[in-house]
Amino acid sequence: MKKRLFALSLVLLSFTARQASPQNMKTEECRIKLPGITFTRSLNHAADHAKVAGGRVTLASEARRDNFRDPDGKLSNNTAPLLLTEVDNKQPFTLTAKVTPTFLKTYDAGTLYIYVKEDLWLKMAMEMDERQKTRMVSVRTIGTSDDNNHDVIEAKSVHMKISSDTKTVGFYYSLDKKSWQLIRLFKNDYPASIWVGISTQCPLGEGTSAVFEDISLTKQSISDFRLGI
């Protein structure tokens, strides 16, 4: 009986260890501490490309780095650097950040993420589109990725917000951090343990970067999912 209990304990410990990092991905432990958040996992060597100064982090992307799983498989790319921290998805949470991307090539972007594994994630981005307009973009990936272009943003920076009350996830942006515009609402049917964080992408260019500041992760949700407040 003791041997069976010991074996069961080993199985449970192994399962717990596997759940301690984003699934099916090679991540590295890190500790990048900012006033409102501490990133503890680095995906695709993100920590090696992050510089912290004055309460902000600049995250660089090397050439041809992106996260997108095209339905036809031709453009799939899972190489963008992500800085992540774990969230208890059984509890409300809100992630906000001011994002200032450097736009050099089409699809360059600074992004916020909800991340579970390589083929299960959500992202919201300030991105340069095919007409060289900068706009809000959202992507939901469940096996393959959808792709949604939203409002054009003429400012150099934008405030982004992801909020969940455990049942619903909302994506929002603001130019003044006061008036928030809804982008998308999703059902929160993600696992009990998820990861949230930031990323920079450069699918077509030779590299770029984005500055993330005023980052905050709280254990509260917004109260109005239409107004984002």
Regions found by a protein language model. Give the residues of each.
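Extracellular glycan-recognition regions
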Residues: Q23-I229
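Bacterial Sec-dependent N-terminal signal peptides
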Residues: M1-M25
